[in-house]
Amino acid sequence: MNTPRIIVAMSGGVDSSVAAWRLNSQREAIAGLFMRNWTDDGNGQCHAEEDRRDAVAVCGILGIAFHFRDFSHEYWQEVFTHFLAEYANGRTPNPDVLCNREIKFKHFLETARELGADRIATGHYARIEHYRQRWHLLRGADRSKDQSYFLHQLGQEQLAATLFPIGDLEKQQLRQLAHQTGLPTHAKKDSTGICFIGERNFREFLKQYLPAQPGEIRDPQEQRIAEHPGVFYFTLGQRQGLNIGGVRNRPPSPWYVIGKDLATNVLYVDQHRDSPFLQSRWLRSEPAHWVSGSPPAPTFTCTAQTRYRQADEPCKVTVRNDGSLDVDFTRTQWAVTPGQSLVLYDGNECLGGAVIATTDAPLERKRARNLSKTENVLQ
């Protein structure tokens, strides 16, 4: 058997199936590899075995070799432990970003090279182009499916060794191709959410690792509204799962999470989705990663997303001495959440991004002050 030049990450879904089919149709020397990133915990919520069988079937139809690698230990150590630590610290992490950086474009890429390949391919909706003497990460043609947000931590080395064969396709086109070519995954439902949680209640899953720490739910005026099981089970802007019944002298309107204070174990809520406590015009990030290797300038304008599938928001970015960013938005932003990813764009090009550290939302400023006081006491 000839040594494959490209190893395709086969997830068992329609996207990676069509990615492999397109490369195979171009007579590229390819093989497929299925990654197991989570060990089934007995709840039957992670469909890894079903996905593996589908990946095997597609590789068989295409006549390409199939490989399997278990990265569950690496995933636990490099993604999941960070995921838990962030929630324990009251932040809302994005494990997909870390999984791409540490697993798919690190361990998987290393494995592909061990198998003799010099490139990898995945079913991501994104594009890579080379011009002006460097590699550029671009949005996928289907803006509703674009995944460049989750790929912003990639650099020049990874892009040089990566192919995104379906980045120029719309999802509907892709499914039609899969159906026309007889791929068994053509009608398979898209995966959503995080595999290790599946269809389970998120809070119940998190309780297995972060035991409940009940505390008070208060409104912006510090009036007690109800009790919560743990502030780390909630995120800014959340409406569901608060279990707040009728409150005396309050209208029967829904409540929204507007802030959390770990130092006092208080969860703050308000009855207005457009509450001023959910609005911010400024954020500071942790040190940023740049796809090109460096920022465009010490200060520059671009657009940003602070959550996946958000519309582009114009902003001014200032790079601080430690590599972190100060970002001033042209318009007020809703529920900008520490722990989530800030991703920067110049048109369709993804420049890079960073983890959001703090904002100028009123309760976030209070949280930062209380946290600083707590740290000073501990010191």
From Swiss-Prot:
Disulfide bonds join C99-C195. It catalyses: S-sulfanyl-L-cysteinyl-[protein] + uridine(34) in tRNA + AH2 + ATP = 2-thiouridine(34) in tRNA + L-cysteinyl-[protein] + A + AMP + diphosphate + H(+). One of its GO terms (biological process) is tRNA wobble position uridine thiolation. It holds the Pfam family tRNA_Me_trans_M. The record marks H124, Q340 as: Interaction with tRNA. Belongs to the MnmA/TRMU family. It is an enzyme of class 2 (transferase). Its EC number is 2.8.1.13. One of its GO terms (molecular function) is tRNA binding. One of its GO terms (cellular component) is cytoplasm. Catalyzes the 2-thiolation of uridine at the wobble position (U34) of tRNA, leading to the formation of s(2)U34. Residues 94-96 are annotated as: Interaction with target base in tRNA. It is found in: Cytoplasm. NCBIfam families: PRK00143.1, trmU. The keyword Transferase applies. ATP binds at A9, M10, S11, G12, G13, V14, D15, S16, M35, G123. Residues 145-147, 307-308 are annotated as: Interaction with tRNA. InterPro entries: MnmA-like, MnmA-like_C, MnmA-like_central, MnmA-like_central_sf, Rossmann-like_a/b/a_fold. Keywords: ATP-binding, Cytoplasm, Disulfide bond, Nucleotide-binding, RNA-binding, Transferase, tRNA processing, tRNA-binding. The active site is at C99 (nucleophile), C195 (cysteine persulfide intermediate). This is tRNA-specific 2-thiouridylase MnmA.
